């Protein structure tokens, strides 16, 4: 298939782009799994193409962070001011330092990438029609050879399409209170700041460990804790947040439980997802939300950078005394604008 014609390809013509298992719908919600893909063969993910994309990417959708001190933990995660730096220089700084960049909602900026992902997911949905995706948000991740993303859990299901470089991912069991409590998971799913159990090396004994060379896709159960370390070279991945009918049912149960805990002081509401009572609980939650009876929580705090990009420095960044507020919309605002991706 012509790489230029990917936007016009049918699900059958796209079958060589990803080795998607037919039992994936069941596995997505129970166990991590890896399959191969061919996205790394596309020129749109080269340094030159990514630099051009960065040059025209809206500032409010581009986030850059550094792990400048090398300490393992979120206290070492610092936002970086990238404004006024060309895409070429930003990529050069990422190569030199310990940097992580995320281009959120890349589908709104690059029609080429949007067409590619639409083609790939047409094939995925052809193979697994019971995977009913409601909306999605693809983002490009570009990170340094020694960058890492610390122990955390996500509010939405995620697929990680690894395209360039090598990385190692640890995924941890979901229903383990020593890793993440039920209450913490409720706050994560609600989009509120939440302190998970601090990472300890002993957690790794319960983890699944996956080394990803280019051309591999990793999926793990929604909301399962995980962490990532890059192993070599500049890393490029496409991360795909999405909501399905199954994940929405689970999220609504946890959101309802959060409301029960907060307003009715129920200390440990049930996380059961199937049956008459869970269905009633979900309906009651949706009604209460529609009537404005539930507080939606605070918006993301302003994004303040205390470092700026400096491609000539050893770490790719330089201190920014006093800090500066950036125009980044924030995760919550970007999630709220999600629209159906598959028609």
Question: What are the roles of these predicted feature ranges?
Answer:
Residues 2-118, 257-264, 288-343:
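Transition-metal
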Residues 21-23, 88-91, 126-130, 145-152:
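Catalytic micro-motifs at enzyme active sites that drive phosphoryl/nucleotidyl and oxygen chemistry
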Residues 103-140:
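A gly/proline- and charged-residue-enriched helix-loop-helix capping module
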Residues 135, 148-158, 205-206:
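A short beta-loop-beta micro-motif enriched in histidine and acidic residues
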Residues 139-153, 172-176:
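Conserved short histidine dyad/triad with adjacent acidic residue
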């Amino acid at each position: 298939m012509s790489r230029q014609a990917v936007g016009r390809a049918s699900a059958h013509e796209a079958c060589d782009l990803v080795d998607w298992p037919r039992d994936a719908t069941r596995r997505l919600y129970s166990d991590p799994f890896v399959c191969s893909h061919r996205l790394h063969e596309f020129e749109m993910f080269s340094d030159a193409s990514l630099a051009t994309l960065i040059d025209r990417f809206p500032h409010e959708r581009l986030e850059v962070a550094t792990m400048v001190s090398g300490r393992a933990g979120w206290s070492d995660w610092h936002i970086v001011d990238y404004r006024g730096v060309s895409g070429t220089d930003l990529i050069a700084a990422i190569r030199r330092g310990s940097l992580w960049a995320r281009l959120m909602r890349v589908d709104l900026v690059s029609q080429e990438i949007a067409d590619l992902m639409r083609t790939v997911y047409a094939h995925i949905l052809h193979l697994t029609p019971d995977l009913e995706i409601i909306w999605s948000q693809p983002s490009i991740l570009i990170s340094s050879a020694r960058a890492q993303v610390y122990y955390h859990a996500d509010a939405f299901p995620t697929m990680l399409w690894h395209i360039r470089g090598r990385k190692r991912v640890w995924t941890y069991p979901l229903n383990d209170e020593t890793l993440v409590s039920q209450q913490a998971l409720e706050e994560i799913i609600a989009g509120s700041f939440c302190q998970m159990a601090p990472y300890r090396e002993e957690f790794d004994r319960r983890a699944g460990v996956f080394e990803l060379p280019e051309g591999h896709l990793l999926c793990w159960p929604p909301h399962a804790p995980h962490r990532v370390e890059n192993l070599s070279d500049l890393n490029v991945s496409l991360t795909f947040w999405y909501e399905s009918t199954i994940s929405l049912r689970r999220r609504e149960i946890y959101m309802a439980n959060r409301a029960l805990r907060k307003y009715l002081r129920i200390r440990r509401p049930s996380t059961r997802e199937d049956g008459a009572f869970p269905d009633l609980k979900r309906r009651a939650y949706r009604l209460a939300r529609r009537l404005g009876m539930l507080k939606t929580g605070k918006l993301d705090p302003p994004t303040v950078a205390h470092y700026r990009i400096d491609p000539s420095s050893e770490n790719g960044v330089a201190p920014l005394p006093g800090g500066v507020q950036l125009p980044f919309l924030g995760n919550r605002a970007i999630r709220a604008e999600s629209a159906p991706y598959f028609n």
